[in-house]
Amino acid sequence: MKCALIGEKLGHSYSKLIHEAFGLYSYELVSLPRDRVGEFMENGDFDAFNVTIPYKRTVMPYCSYISPEAQKIGSVNTVIRTQDGLHGFNTDYFGFKSMAARAGIDFAGKKVVILGSGGTSLTAKAVAADCGADRITVVSRSGEYNYENLEKLCDCEVLINTTPVGMYPNNGCSAVKLDSFPRCEAVLDVIYNPLRTELIMQALERGISCSGGLYMLVAQAAQSAKYFCSAEIGEKEIERVFRSLALDVQNIVLVGMPGCGKTTVAAALERLTGRKSVDTDSLVEEAAGMSVPDIFSEYGEAHFRELEAQAIRGIAKEKGLIIATGGGAVRSEEHTSELQ
């Protein structure tokens, strides 16, 4: 069985890794310009495929059947070829609901605020409504509720980010500060790269129930597999694939005083795991064209810390590395947050 993901830009997609981890079918990534979507839908040689931005609505007119949840949300992310034509489904609903449930987040009777008004916003709104939310408010850049009047929503209890703000490579950004929502008790962010966005880090610092979007991505893929080949992938298998992928994309960060052996341990871990190791002091030296002692001697510690901050900010965005930090790097709360 040949399956695929279609979208415009798929360079950073995890979908192939996830679907092939289920071990049920081959799976390819197919980047398509908009003017080739119709041709693919009508003549493509894939038995089934997922659809990502910006084509979740584009594919709908080509489907002879659209499932109730896809009609309700207004987008299709899963298509199968049948003798009766193309059948479209939406598995994001299942994925989002599963993510919230795993995080222990209950929408019943809650005041929910959704950041963003795109397709994923509609999914979040549908799930929250079906789960009994008391009030659901969508915040957009130009809507009645926007980022200039968030004080009107200070009673928010569940905050959901469906915007791309904070997504790789713009790590460290957040559409809002949780200080604007003093009653917030749960946060969901559909972004899965990075594993923990700035918004999720704010929630973790406050002890608020939260989840990033990676579990949603794996759960919706499992539901897609059900449509692809009638496979029943349970919670244990979803959890296994999620944990395996989360471990693969996280960096291993070594901290400690100078001379404690971080570089030696990094080299040993590199041999053991096959991961690439990176030393932040080496990155600083490469950028400056001189050694760390010479930087301290000629320009002082403040200049070195500026170079170190730039190095950490850049390397922390990457995935699956072993990062050996300088002795004073973790004295900065900003660095500690970035490296997580």
Residue ranges of each PLM-predicted region?
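Phosphate/diphosphate ligand-binding glycine-rich loop within oxidoreductases
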Residues: 2-103, 194-196, 202, 206-209, ...
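NAD(P)-binding Rossmann-fold cofactor-contacting core
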Residues: 131-147, 281-287
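Conserved small/polar residues in nucleotide/adenosyl-binding loops
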Residues: 334-340
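Conserved lysine of the Walker
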Residues: 262
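ATP-dependent small-molecule kinase phosphotransfer cores
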Residues: 282-331
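Adenosine-phosphate binding glycine-rich loop
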Residues: 190-250
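Rossmann-like adenosine-cofactor binding region
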Residues: 145-211, 326-333
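Glycine-rich adenosine-cofactor-binding loop
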Residues: 7, 88-93, 100, 105, ...
